[in-house]
Swiss-Prot record:
Molecular-function annotations in GO: dipeptide transmembrane transporter activity; oligopeptide transmembrane transporter activity; proton-dependent oligopeptide secondary active transmembrane transporter activity
pH-related activity note: Optimum pH is 6.
Sequence segments annotated as region (Disordered): 1-28
Principal cellular location given in the protein's record: membrane
Descriptive protein name: Peptide transporter family 1
Membrane topology, as annotated: Multi-pass membrane protein
Positions with biased composition (Low complexity): 7-16
CDD domains: MFS_SLC15A1_2_like
GO BP terms: dipeptide import across plasma membrane; dipeptide transmembrane transport; oligopeptide transport; protein transport
Disulfide bonds: none
Transmembrane region(s): 74-94, 104-124, 132-152, 173-193, 207-227, 334-354, 364-384, 597-619, 629-649, 659-679
Subcellular location: Membrane
Keywords: Membrane, Peptide transport, Protein transport, Transmembrane, Transmembrane helix, Transport
């Protein structure tokens, strides 16, 4: 029998012998469910696999599969969109057929298979359709991870007895999110190292290993999940509530058509009560009120998920050298989970209580702040991109009617050049370059070119310059001819943290081999053979110290910095000796990669305010029978957000990346105002309402028989002294009630 305690004023009123006491019973404390440990561990391993694979995916698409940045961005967000579409299917399977446990188990096996297929596809085997294998693997991963997403967090919530453990449930979601970001932190730290610092199959990187290690962790996650089977509280499937909701809406429409004049009702859905019952109608109304709030959410996810695509590509154009240590572009993604691990306790114990003192403690208020912070993060990224674009004009024309022209002098003589496109005759020093990056041109033209030696015994060169609007073209004076080649500077400068070198050799035929070798603090690459006749060829090297050897003799050496394109001009012969000059043609990576930190910090704070709060809000406010479905709808908003990125990337609404970032930030501000308008009248549902006795209707009756109608009290009431009011209701974060309770 439960012990009894006095509540209120205890003791006796001495002289009068009167005493006031009110007795109430309390149940013994419910122990924290041990099964949660297996769920948290499983989530850690699964997230390690997902984020490890996702971290390097865009670089794999560009570096190995040959896609450009735009196409890689579209593919990345299409994959992410599928990842968040399949939760709806997973929820249907869990709620209507297998239950959460079996759904998680079976789809995790599909997930593991997909991870292994992607890893196998990264092995450079002759004749293997790498792109097709990768697509199949990514599709299996999308089915697996998407299918289990709505089930795992809800399955964890099922382990708690509510409302008695509502406080522990709130802390579980923080712990659950902690596990997600711990797995993400470790995988985003080490997966780029496996990719870049390990050499395999004759390549300078090892994507197969970088994909393979996370795949092994995914297999471990399945084993861990199965190990806790005996401890799980497995709720039986509550019925396929998608069809239940659809039936409710369809019956309401039929009833409205027949009885709207003779029997007007307050709500459209009330017309379905005779067929599906009062409780089903009320839960459908509750679902509709929550989904109405979800409408603006996709824009947030459109911004958030670009950390893995656009922000990673932005990092490739930045200088990763920090105190002698080279930060890889994809490693910047590690900052987000690292900050999450610190931000969760910071927000729980400092920021949220501080906001509560200012009257900001409701979930919808926190969600609004999260939207605002996301907009701020993208305004910061737009500002950073503008700074980088100031140097980008050297790589490629920034206007469609602009042309870049460079003329390299590979001769040991000074040359005076003249042409109709050159306003006045110019002198080019030996082994140097003349350039004009602001030529205005509306159509393709040919111009006569004349190069006369000013000093030394060199021949005159007369040829043609062929220029096109919006293009960058270079010419090389060598021996007695003018060699034309396309620059390819933009691609070189954005090649994921590597450096590009072009060799312009004015040496006798037959002298060689000409070798380019590089050495960094962590590795030494095998020498590359330079082909004198292949002038346009760009050689990708790792930043470090580079040298050029001809016939085993060192000709040139220089420090190759990240994100640069160098032209090495060499003239002479083995008999007379060689002369050289190293020209840094493009230096896009002059902005430190650490300048990405402010936008990452702001976006991480937005994630904590929005995602953690939204996860708890969705679970606590959803009807008991629809929790997995509502979780799937939450994740479906992520899919729509990624589809928005695909649309904007494909239609190219702006001509610059900074303009695109500004567009997303502006959309976020408009989206936030829409959310404020939608949330202004939302009334929170107390979790304890889910556990009040309801003898008149059950969810089972929706599928099986016609229930009795019930009357639902929608007037304001008090719950534990907390009065419901518009936009607040009886819901509050109970963790702060002791300190900030209202009168």
């Amino acid at each position: 029998m439960a012990s009894e305690i006095t509540n209120g004023k205890n003791g006796q009123n001495g002289k009068n012998g009167q005493k006031e006491e009110s007795d109430s019973q309390i149940a013994p404390p419910i122990p924290y469910p041990k099964s949660v440990a297996f769920i948290i561990s499983n989530e850690f391993c699964e997230r390690f696999n997902y984020y490890g694979m996702r971290t390097i995916l865009v670089l794999y698409l560009t570096n190995k599969l040959g896609y450009n940045e735009e196409t890689a961005t579209v593919l990345f967000h299409t994959f992410t969109m599928l990842v968040y579409i399949f939760p709806l299917i997973g929820a249907l399977i869990a709620d209507g057929w297998l239950g959460k446990y079996k759904t998680i188990l079976y789809l995790s096996l599909v997930y593991s298979l997909g991870a292994m297929v992607v890893s196998f596809g990264a092995v450079p085997l002759s004749g293997m359709p790498t792109k097709a294998v990768t697509v199949v693997g990514l599709l299996l991963i999308a089915i697996g991870t998407g299918g289990i997403k709505p089930c795992v967090s809800a399955f964890g919530g099922d382990q708690f007895s509510l409302p008695a453990q509502s406080f522990q449930l709130a802390k579980f979601f923080s712990l659950f999110y902690f596990a997600i970001n711990a797995g993400s932190l470790i995988s985003t730290t080490f997966t780029p190292i496996l990719r870049a610092d390990v050499h395999c199959f004759g390549d300078q990187d090892c994507f197969s290993l970088a994909f393979g290690v996370p795949a092994i962790l995914m297999i471990f996650s399945v084993i861990i999940f199965m190990a806790g089977k005996r401890l799980y509280r497995c709720q039986p499937p509550a019925g396929n509530m998608i069809f239940g909701v659809s039936r409710c809406i369809a019956d309401a429409f039929k009833g409205w058509q027949k009885r709207r004049h003779s029997e007007p009702m307050e709500s459209f859905l009330d017309y379905a009560k005779p067929t599906v019952g009062s409780r089903m109608v009320q839960e459908t109304k509750c679902l509709g009120r929550i989904l109405r709030l979800f409408l603006p959410f996709p824009v947030f996810w459109a911004l958030f998920d670009q950390q893995g695509s656009r922000w990673t590509f932005q990092a490739t154009r930045m200088d990763g050298n920090v105190l002698g240590f080279q930060i890889k572009p994809d490693q910047m993604q590690v900052v987000n989970p690292l900050l999450i691990l610190g931000f969760l306790p910071l927000f729980d114990y400092i920021i949220y209580p501080a906001l509560a003192r200012c009257g900001i403690r409701r979930p919808l208020q926190k969600l609004t702040l999260g939207l605002l912070l996301a907009a701020l993060g993208f305004f910061l990224s737009a500002g950073l991109e503008m700074k980088m674009e100031q140097a980008a004009y050297r790589a490629t024309p920034i206007e469609p009617d602009m042309t870049h022209l460079r003329i390299y002098n590979g001769m040991p003589c000074r040359y005076e050049i003249s042409s109709a496109v050159v306003q006045t005759p110019r002198v080019i020093e030996p082994l140097n370059v003349w350039e004009d990056l602001s030529l205005q041109m509306t159509e393709s033209k040919e111009y006569t070119f004349n190069a006369q030696p000013v000093s030394g015994e060199c021949p005159s060169i007369i040829d043609k310059l062929r220029l096109q609007p919006g293009k960058s073209v270079s010419y090389f004076l060598a021996q007695d001819k003018l060699v034309e080649f396309a620059d390819g500077l933009q691609m070189a400068a954005t090649d994921t943290g590597r450096t590009s070198v072009r060799a312009l050799l004015n040496t006798p035929d037959g002298e060689g081999p000409v070798l380019l070798s590089t050495e960094s603090a962590t590795s030494q690459e095998p020498p590359l053979t330079l082909d004198k006749g292949n002038v346009p060829q760009l050689h990708r090297i790792t930043p470090g110290f580079a040298r050029v050897d001809i016939n085993g003799k060192k000709v040139a050496s220089f420090e190759a910095k990240e994100g640069r394109l160098y032209s090495i001009l060499v003239t002479g012969s083995a008999r007379d000796g060689y002369q050289h000059n190293v020209i840094e043609v493009v230096a896009l990576s002059t902005v430190s990669i650490l300048w990405q930190l402010p936008q990452i910090v702001v976006m991480t704070a937005a994630e904590v305010m929005f995602s953690v709060t939204g996860l708890e809000f969705s679970y606590s406010q959803s009807p008991p029978s629809m929790k997995s479905v509502l979780q799937a709808c939450w994740l479906l908003s992520v899919a729509i957000g990624n589809m928005l990125v695909v649309v904007i990337a494909e239609f190219k609404f702006t001509s610059s990346q900074s303009g695109e970032f500004t567009l997303f930030a502006s959309l976020m501000l408009v989206d936030m105002m829409i959310f404020l308008w939608l949330a202004r009248s939302y009334q929170y549902k107390d979790q304890r309402e889910d556990f009040e006795d309801d003898d008149d209707a059950t969810i089972d009756s929706v599928m099986q028989s016609k229930p009795k109608a019930t009357t639902v009290d929608t007037t304001a009431r008090k719950t534990n002294g907390i009065e419901a009011e518009p936009g607040y209701g009886a819901y509050r974060n109970h963790a702060y009630d002791n300190d900030f309770s209202e009168a």
